[in-house]
């Protein structure tokens, strides 16, 4: 007998739209082995759903790290197949997408569009024209403009989304990066009594003023009709497989736009991150950071030290989501400063080859080092980051216990943990992360 599984980090709101998008993931999650496979998946989806000319075609799960021989999806592939439809295929990291020409035009992206700090706009070789892939801060204005479903559609989607989680044994889900309009969707669902699993939301720091104009600090930390505002989310960097995570040393493969000596870039400056976290702490709220690279984790630690004024006695349960390329010395700091880690061992299966290419075998082998973290005394959890990876809690457990790649190769076997420890990461430890250890896990 096991308790209901607790999701330490995913994107619940994305489950609502899964049925409205084509699965463009590579095997074993989806059928798209190469750019042609992505196009076929989109065409089949458009045919089955009778999408008319001019209507948007959406896909999810595109993984450039799995495309053969560096043959990456670009706008030309999509333009040829969909000359009359805007098309957007979400990157597997959820930090960007590949758009065709009509979609680029729809969202105002052109040769005149400058790349913002912390953003990526891949350009067609020899030109300044966007070639399809838009990532990180450059993608945020596009994401904000995505079409919204009707109220009737939302009601059905909320039910189907919860069933994705419930079918995997999850009784507490996380909406781990919530825009205000998505929070309103969740709030309306809760008010209507449509939630049958618990959902914990972490609104983006960039929308904190708008959120706090609707809610008070007393609204955080408690469930109301199965919805809880857990705290605030601060995203410090991107994804390592997308080469947008922020490191102290360069990527072996350069940057996504061909940059040399590329270490990635932070989403915000250190000073901005410091001020953001202090605002969260001054409100008495929990913070979850998104940080993958070791330089991004350094920024989280510095912000925590600044915002806390060096007082680490308060029970804040600040959590660094992913913590994938954390260094041993940073784990020591986690313990000293009472920072939690939510790891992501499924990367040892899904993205190990990309990490070895990008970061080298030694660093890739210390990916999500749960055994070392637990031995040092770090309280840690383990997550899917759905829909980056499928909702499958037993796969989460398996990946932490075995650390085997898609190709059957061990990835840092010295960091394997026991089945019991792996279960704790999605039950009792996850309950602790949410301040719910007295009643869950």
Go through the PLM ranges and name each one:
Residues 156, 278-288, 295-318, 322-323, ...:
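His/Asp/Glu-enriched, well-ordered alpha-helical/loop segment
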Residues 1-215, 230, 234-296, 316-317, ...:
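Divalent metal-binding segments
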Residues 221-228:
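Acidic/histidine-enriched ion/cofactor-binding microenvironments in catalytic or ligand-binding pockets
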Residues 191-196, 222, 307-314:
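Short helix-capping segments at alpha-helix termini
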């Amino acid at each position: 007998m096991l308790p209901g599984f607790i999701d330490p980090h995913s994107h619940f709101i994305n489950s609502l739209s899964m049925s409205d998008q084509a699965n463009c993931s590579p095997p074993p999650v989806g059928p798209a082995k190469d750019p042609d496979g992505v196009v076929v998946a989109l065409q089949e989806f458009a045919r089955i759903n009778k999408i008319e000319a001019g209507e948007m075609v959406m896909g999810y799960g595109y993984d450039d790290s799995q495309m053969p021989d560096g043959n990456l999806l670009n706008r030309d592939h999509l333009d040829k197949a969909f000359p009359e439809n805007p098309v957007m295929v979400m990157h597997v990291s959820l930090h960007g997408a590949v758009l065709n020409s009509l979609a680029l035009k729809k969202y105002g992206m052109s040769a005149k569009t400058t790349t913002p700090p912390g953003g990526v706009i891949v350009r067609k070789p020899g030109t300044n024209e966007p070639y399809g892939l838009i990532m990180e801060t450059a993608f945020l204005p596009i994401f904000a403009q995505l079409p919204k479903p009707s109220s009737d559609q939302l009601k059905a989607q909320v039910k189907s989304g919860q069933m994705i989680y419930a079918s995997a044994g999850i009784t507490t889900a996380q909406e781990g990066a919530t825009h205000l309009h998505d929070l309103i969707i969740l709030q309306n669902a809760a008010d209507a009594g449509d939630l049958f699993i618990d959902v914990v939301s972490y609104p983006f720091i960039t929308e904190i003023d708008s959120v706090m104009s609707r809610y008070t600090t007393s609204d955080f930390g408690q469930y109301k009709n199965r919805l809880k505002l857990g705290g605030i989310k601060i995203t410090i960097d991107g994804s390592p497989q997308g080469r947008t995570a922020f490191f102290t040393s360069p990527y072996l493969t350069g940057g996504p736009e061909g940059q040399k000596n590329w270490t990635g870039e932070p989403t915000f400056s250190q000073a901005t991150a410091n001020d953001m976290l202090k605002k969260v702490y001054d409100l008495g709220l929990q913070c979850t950071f998104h940080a993958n690279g070791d330089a991004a984790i350094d920024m989280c630690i510095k912000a925590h030290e600044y915002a806390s004024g060096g007082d680490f006695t308060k029970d804040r349960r600040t959590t660094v989501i992913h913590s994938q390329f954390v260094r041993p010395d940073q784990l020591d700091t986690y313990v000293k400063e009472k920072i939690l880690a939510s790891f992501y061992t499924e990367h040892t299966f899904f993205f190990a080859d990309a990490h070895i290419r990008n970061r080298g075998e030694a660093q890739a082998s210390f990916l999500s080092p749960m055994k070392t973290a637990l031995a040092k005394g770090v309280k840690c959890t383990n997550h899917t980051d759905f829909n980056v990876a499928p909702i499958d809690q037993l796969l989460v457990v398996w990946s932490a216990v075995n650390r085997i790649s898609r190709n059957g190769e061990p990835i840092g076997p010295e960091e394997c943990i026991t089945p019991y420890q792996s279960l704790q990461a999605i039950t009792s430890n996850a309950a602790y992360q949410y301040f719910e250890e007295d009643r869950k896990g």
